[in-house]
């Protein structure tokens, strides 16, 4: 999948504390320094823990945004803060926009300053490289030009663009009735969304394709077929008032003319669909999150599947897998669970990247997996949240929230962050708490029209 990045990353040996201070110097007499007890972790209540992890995750997009564009950096290394500091993640920036809306609503960041920043960000996107309306996967924050994601991936990326457009629509809906500056921001978001040529990315077929390059055309040849993280591209394509895709692209492309359905089960829980490459099992948990930051799966069904049940089952299966722990990794439990794409520990101890899932379990837990599943598994996700903040806060929480990944088995922690992993935490926890981002996205008139055109029904929203 597109998210399976070979980062060629170096080996991390030390966990860096963001709050460390120099030790006092000895007096030169050889007398041992006094021992200072480690600070005691004050346990947080459930509400306090949800507040804190949302505040912490917001920092990635507020304190560590790309300096020129104010959009989301692809990654942030606590030991190399300037590493690839100009690379903007298009999809991660969409998640970041929704994260900032949560921050405003909860009073964690100042509203007026956030509006100014988002206006800067959207004006940057307005002038950045676009390819038939779609943005590339990576953008240079200094110039707005495309940074190739791979040799032939130097053009439009319709999936990353869809993730961004979820954020644009949430911003539009949140600010459309605000003051003059806010209404201007909403109009800018609307213009950007309406400029995407979704139908171009069908290449005239009854399916959508991930990439198009002005140099290599359709050479990447990646057809979007379910089930994975790309459902939102089809929904937004059908919802577009300017460049809509045909309904047949959804039914034949995403749904594979019904072949998306699968009757297998794991741990007595129905898998429901064919997870790409998982042969009767489930894929990484980001598949249950990226398309659903804005699109509310509760009570949402099409001809083939109930997406509320599907996403909940996916999260429950991953939880049960970690509890069963068939590979006998030390540390897996009902409070330490969660498999998704993230940084990982390679066999030789270096840091790499992989899509963790039951069929690709390397003993690495990724915090965003359980945290961003709060709407589906609130009890199980709360156990993990309290484990993070009440038991492991000193080594697993850093300057922008939970570190990207850790392995209890190998006593390994990466002190790195990724936009696409931090960016789902605050919105999905907020969807669990108040449904804020779901309500904003689902109230967009064109989204409802698009969903209905594809045969979707929603008991939650009455259509």
Regions found by a protein language model. Name each.
Residues 2-3, 205:
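Generic structural signal for short, solvent-exposed loop/turn connectors between secondary structure elements
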Residues 3-4, 13-43:
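Bacterial Sec-dependent N-terminal signal peptides
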Residues 33-463:
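Ser/Thr/Asn(+Pro)-rich, low-complexity disordered segments
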């Amino acid at each position: 999948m597109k998210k399976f990045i070979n980062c060629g990353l170096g080996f991390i040996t030390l966990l860096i504390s963001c709050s460390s201070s120099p030790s006092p110097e000895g007096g030169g007499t050889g007398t041992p320094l006094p021992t200072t007890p480690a600070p005691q972790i004050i346990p947080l209540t459930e509400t306090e823990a949800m507040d804190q992890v949302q505040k912490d995750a917001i920092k990635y997009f507020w304190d560590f945004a790309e300096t020129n564009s104010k959009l989301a950096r692809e990654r942030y290394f606590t030991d190399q803060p300037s590493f690839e500091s100009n690379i903007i993640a298009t999809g991660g920036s969409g998640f970041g926009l929704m994260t900032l809306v949560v921050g405003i609503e909860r009073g964690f960041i100042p509203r007026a300053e956030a509006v100014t920043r988002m206006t800067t960000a959207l004006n940057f996107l307005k002038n950045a490289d676009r390819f038939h309306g779609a943005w590339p996967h990576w953008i240079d924050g200094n110039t707005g030009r495309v940074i190739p994601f791979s040799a032939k991936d130097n053009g439009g990326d319709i999936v990353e663009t869809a993730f961004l457009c979820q954020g644009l629509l949430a911003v539009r809906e949140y600010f459309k009735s605000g003051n003059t500056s806010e209404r201007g921001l909403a109009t800018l978001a609307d213009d950007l969304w309406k400029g995407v040529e979704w139908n171009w990315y069908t290449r005239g077929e009854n399916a959508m394709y991930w990439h198009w390059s002005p140099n290599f055309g359709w050479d990447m040849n990646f057809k979007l077929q379910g089930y994975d993280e790309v459902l939102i591209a089809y929904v937004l394509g059908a919802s577009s008032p300017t460049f809509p895709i045909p309904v047949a692209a959804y039914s034949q492309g995403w749904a594979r003319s019904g072949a998306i359905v699968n009757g297998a089960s794991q741990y007595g829980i129905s898998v429901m669909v064919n997870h790409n490459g998982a042969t009767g099992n489930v894929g990484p948990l980001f598949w249950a999150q990226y398309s659903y930051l804005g699109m509310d799966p509760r009570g949402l069904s099409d001809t083939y599947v109930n997406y509320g049940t599907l996403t909940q089952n996916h999260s429950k299966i991953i939880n049960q897998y970690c509890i069963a722990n068939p590979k006998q990794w030390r540390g897996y439990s009902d409070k330490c669970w969660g498999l998704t794409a993230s940084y990982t520990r390679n066999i030789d101890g270096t840091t790499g990247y992989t899509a963790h899932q039951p069929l690709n379990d390397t003993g690495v837990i990724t915090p965003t997996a359980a945290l961003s599943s709060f709407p589906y598994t609130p009890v199980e996700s709360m156990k993990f949240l309290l484990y993070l903040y009440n038991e492991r806060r000193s080594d697993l929480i850093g300057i922008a929230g939970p570190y990207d990944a850790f392995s209890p088995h190998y006593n390994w922690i990466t002190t790195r962050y990724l936009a696409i992993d931090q960016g789902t935490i605050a919105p999905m926890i907020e969807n669990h708490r108040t449904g804020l981002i779901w309500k904003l996205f689902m109230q967009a008139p064109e989204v409802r029209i698009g969903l209905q055109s594809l045969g979707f029904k929603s008991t939650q929203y009455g259509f």
